[in-house]
Amino acid sequence: VINNALSQAFFSLSLGMGILITYGSYLDKKDNIVKAGSMVAIADTSVAFIAGLLILPAIFYFNPQVNTAELSDSSVSLIFVLLPNIFLTLQDTIGYFGAHAIATVFFLLVFFAAITSLVSIIEVPVAYLIDEKNISRRRALILLALTGGALVIMSALSFGVLTIFTEFTTYAGQSKSFFDVIIDVFYDTILPLNGLMVCLFVSFRWKHYQLTHELAMGNNTYAGSWLEKYMSFSLSSFIPTILLLIFCNTVAQKFFAYSLLGF
């Protein structure tokens, strides 16, 4: 549960993927990063909390026998199995057209959320190809579209369509599909590892005084504040320690079926 919660937090806030670093490079030196970061974190957490209060009670109300593992292990069954069943059940109370109208609006919102997330995610490799490889944005987008499209097709085929992708490999005593490998490696494992590496880089390579200087350029009250002291302490102490423990436990659980922390 802790591993999944951490991975979800990293993904929801776009942490550990280079997105914020890439977008941050486009900001003006005088922009208030402290205020902007606080607003994003508070808004994202609030929306996620409210969504949980709305969705989870509805799921258990319409389907009291639901397997809780389906809710915690993957969001795929939540979006494409459990919620559609709720929309079908709503036909008994608000009618066919009302239920389908709600379902249509919901999946449109999911579509736009996916598109906006894709834009931010794809900007990272696009910026790398443009800045480091001197490739035009058009060529970079075409290259990434072909690569990403191939991975998407392989992931889609791993849901029981082709055995080679459905039974892609085996580890931790279980057969894993290509989609499972993508989730286990890049979602559950790499995101916390990247967060750990950023903490170590800021604390021991870039140094805290440079971080303070950059943030203070857009916020005159940051230097010497309790937030500055907290960040300087946490980034070099308990945050990387927690991330390291969770990363090691995630690797042990996902790939060796063994829990280092006992949960």
Located regions from the model:
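Loop-to-transmembrane helix boundary motifs in multi-pass membrane proteins
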Residues: A43-F49, G98-A103, F112-I115, Y128-T166, ...
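Membrane-embedded translocation segments of transport machinery
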Residues: V1-I115, V119, R139-A140
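A generic transmembrane alpha-helix motif of multi-pass inner-membrane proteins
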Residues: Y171-V202, A223-F263
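Transmembrane alpha-helical segments in integral membrane proteins
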Residues: S14-K29, L109-A127, N194-T212, F247, ...
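Transmembrane helix-loop junctions in multi-pass membrane proteins
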Residues: V1, Y26-N32, L54-N67, L90-A101, ...
